[in-house]
Amino acid sequence: MPGYETRFLLDASAPRPEASTPTAASSAGADALDAYSRTVIDAVRAAAPAVVHLRVLGKGPDGTVGPRGSGSGVIFTPDGFVLTNSHVVNGATSITATLSDGRSVVAWPVGEDPDTDLAVLRLHDSVPGWAPLGSSAALQVGQLVVAIGNPLGFEATVTA
């Protein structure tokens, strides 16, 4: 056909695009992404010792006690108070916390609020680490946050 030319992708005679050099904008973007990654890594290193995996036993519909589920929690005081979700521990007959150092200890319910889906547990044992609670008043809508959990026993799962 007049005006058309067929070339193959590996045609050695085809002109090659010039290699692009990184621009200041792409370099700045890469630097910002790397800085963000380092910030997330630092946050995980600091908080991961405070994250626990919770295994919950409870009564089933037939009245027998068995596994009801699992979840994550965070130790928020040096004396072993744990914050978790109410739906994780509601109706539990027994709660076991696996700590970041591998120990499994009994977690005792202190209180829960199903309306806010929050619960507090207590570990009567030494803890490998704790993460103090911050203030939500210090946050702004759209601000980036890091969530660290231990779903199904997968250690230090991160959402950032």
PLM features: residue spans?
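A broadly tuned "polar low-complexity/structure-edge" signature
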Residues: P2, R7-L10, S100, A107, ...
